[in-house]
Amino acid sequence: MFDAARAAFLGAAVFISVLLVASFFSPTQGRAVEPAPAGAPAQQGSLPNDALGSIEPIHDVDLGGAGQQSPLPAPVDPDPTFNPQPPFVPGELREGFVDVGNGNLRRYLIHVGTNYRPHAPELTPVVFGFGGWKDTPEKFAEYSRFELTDFGANAIIIYPEGIARAWEGAPYAATRMGDDVHFVRTILNAVDADYRIDRGRVYAVGMSNGGGMAASLACHAPDLVAGVVSVSAAYYEPVVADCAPGAVATLDIHGTHDEVIAYQGGMRHGAPFLGAEQVVAGVAARNGCGPALPPRWIEGPAEHYGFAGCAAPVEHIRVLGQKHVWNGVPHATTLAWEFLHRQHK
C-alpha cells in the first residue's frame, strides 16, 4: 500500500516539474503590467488598482477595428434625471397635485430638504407621512414636526391627503384597497421627474389610521418602501391581509393604555382590528425573523423589542401607560428617523 502511494507521489512530482519548466520559458514571462491612467475612476464592482498585483491586463481582440479597445461602461446612476429648476424650493412646505386617473386630482404637501441642491443634487430619501382619521396633512405636519428634525434637512417629506381624510382598509375609508397605494406611487413618480430621489430609500410613517396606511404599503407594496413606522396604529384586517412577498423594515410604537385603538386589538366602527403584538409577530414571520430578543428598557418608560436574523429589521416599542397619541417620550419623530435612515433596499 505504501509503495503504491510513493510511486504515485513520484509520478506527480515529475509532472509538476515539467509544467514549471514550460512556464519559465513561456513567451509572456516578464511582460510589464501597464499602469492605470492617473485619477481613473473606479468602476462599480471592480477591485482597487493596488489589489491587482502583477496580473497582466487583458486586451481586446482586434476584430477589424484596427486594434481599437471598447470603452469601459460608465457607472450606472440610479436616478440620472432631475430638474435644476424644480417646482418646489428646498426648505418650504408647499402644495402639490397629481392626476390619479381619469382626470381625478389628489392633493399632497411637500417639503424638500434644506440640504437639497437643485443644480447638483445628491440622491435623496423620500418620507411619506400619513395623519390619522380626520387629520389634514397640515395638521399632521404640525404635530409630527418632521421638518424640524434630520428629515427636514436630508429628505423629501410628502404628506398625502386622504379622501374624506381617511386611508384604505379602515371601515370608514372612502377609497378601496389599492387606491391609496396607487396614489402614493403616482406622487413618487411625479416627484422623481423633478428631483434626484433614491428609490432604495423610500419610507412611510403614520399615526393611527395613517399608521395602518404605512403598514398597508409594507404589506401590499413591499417593492415601493424600504421601511415603515406606525404609531398608535389602527390595523384593520384588510391592511395586513394577503400581503405580497417581500421584506420591509418595520417599527411599531403603541401605548398600553390606548383608549381608541386598544393595544391588544378589538372592535371599532363595527370592524375588528388586530393588536400591536399580533401584527408585529406577523411582520416578523413575513421577514423571516428568528426568535424575539430580550427587551431593553428605554425612556418612556417603554420596552423595546427586536428579533434575530430578519431579512429586514422588525422592532416594537411598547410604551407603558401611553394613550392614543403621537408620543413625545420617547419622541416618535426622533425614533422614526433613527430607525428609517439606516434602511435601504
Language-model features: locations:
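Alpha-helical scaffolding within the catalytic cores
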Residues: 140-147, 234-242, 298-305
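C-terminal catalytic histidine-bearing segment of alpha/beta-hydrolase fold enzymes
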Residues: 249-253, 273, 284-345
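Serine-hydrolase catalytic machinery in alpha/beta-hydrolase-like enzymes
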Residues: 98, 104-117, 121-203, 212-216, ...
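Conserved alpha/beta-hydrolase "acid-adjacent" motif
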Residues: 259-264, 271-275, 327-329
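Active-site nucleophile loop of the alpha/beta-hydrolase fold
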Residues: 162, 229-237, 255-258
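The conserved beta1-alpha1 loop
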Residues: 125-132, 232, 254-255, 320
